[in-house]
Amino acid sequence: MDGFVLPPGLIRPPGEAPAYDAWLAALPQAVAGLADRWSLRLGPPFLPGGSSAWVAPAATADGDPAVLKVGWVHDEAEHEADGLRAWDGRGTVRLLRAHRDGQTQALLLESCRPGVPLSDVLPGPEQDAVLAGLLRRLWITPPPGGVFRPLEAMCGAWVRRFEMDYGCARALGRDQVDPGVARAAMALFRELPAAAPDSVLLATDLHHGNVLASEREP
């Protein structure tokens, strides 16, 4: 793909993750193929970009604005398309199309305009109020089929990762958290999700920088 721009956020040290390196090498061809598949005219990607997806403004064959997101499939993004389908534009952009090919997940998204991050337009306490209201809107009953990972399983994985990292840090004399506090915190990580009375859909990467102003949604 001539003139392909690779955002710096996608660049990782060579050899750190061979499968990711292969995905990144094939990314220009994947983007070009998706532009043909969906008849898109692409603009330059948003910079500096994220750490696992190439994202750029696009125009459809009808001239409608959209956004193309071509991502590396990893645990945190495994069910991104499923979540957007379930929310169907309620508190989120709408999912227009999706295509999965191996470790590449492509999403054609509604363009969010003006797209200004919440963190850029409101002071901290007001940001928190907006975020809290959005959280409640996104807490919907998960659709049937059980495709989403339960929070209990996610927290269990985080606990195991923390315990491994914390054990290594203690062995090297670099631990900065009291062992009792660490044990209590990890116990809560295990217990609270298991005791939750209701099951709702969660956005696991929701923060002030990921909430954008939109003309369609307040």
Describe the residue ranges of each PLM region:
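Protein kinase glycine-rich loop
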Residues: 44-49
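Hydrophobic residue at the +6 position relative to the catalytic HRD Asp in the kinase catalytic loop
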Residues: 209-211
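ATP phosphate-binding glycine-rich loop
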Residues: 52-58
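Active-site beta-strand-loop-beta-strand hairpin of nuclease catalytic cores
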Residues: 59-66, 214-218
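Juxta-kinase regulatory segment immediately upstream of eukaryotic protein kinase catalytic domains
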Residues: 1-42
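A conserved alpha-helical element in kinase catalytic cores
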Residues: 28, 62-108, 116-138
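An alpha-helical support segment within catalytic cores of ATP-dependent transferases
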Residues: 26-31, 143-204, 214-216
